[in-house]
């Protein structure tokens, strides 16, 4: 990976930086303040506030992991007993920190949920679920996204004892799809393009979700 970055567990002190990162990565218009100002003027729900509230709750779940004090290295998660106890909660938020200036430039979340794919496998097994992979635009194309995903693979396999992971991505997110395919993920199911409405009509889904799974971590 090009550049000096440290992977570690997120902590409550990272709340504002992670909120900025999430908004910049997923909704750049809000990062520029344009839509945020419009929402405030119209008294609509504030996107940034919703992101911040969600992160605050999830970082609270990570407090025990942060207190364990282990950092995530390039070779895998620390296997201290304290960190293993934290992983029993089966949720972690990893951040990538620039070693030069301390800025947070990447994040990813990993939890455990019933895996809906492949659809013929029922009951659906509980498997690690990767979500909210984000890298600041200034830190992209350096392999950081791949390193965050690989860190989740190592943690899921060596700390939690799983051999599979799953996620979903929007069909039009070509960059993310390319990354996941390069790491061995396979598309198991895609949302239908057309949805039936209760009134009997149909609605087109312009950017359907694609559910991906990786076997043999």
Residue ranges and their predicted role:
Residues 141-154, 178-182:
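Conserved acetyl-CoA-binding loop-helix of GNAT-fold acetyltransferases
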Residues 136-138, 142, 171-172:
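Active-site acidic-Proline motif in GNAT/NAT acetyltransferases
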Residues 9-15, 20-138, 149-150, 155-159, ...:
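Acetyl-CoA-dependent GNAT
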Residues 132-134, 143, 184:
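Conserved functional loop/turn residues at catalytic and ligand-binding sites
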Residues 142, 159-163:
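Short coil/turn segments at alpha/beta junctions that flank glycine-rich nucleotide-binding fingerprints
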Residues 162-177, 181-217:
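C-terminal "cap" of GNAT-fold acetyltransferases
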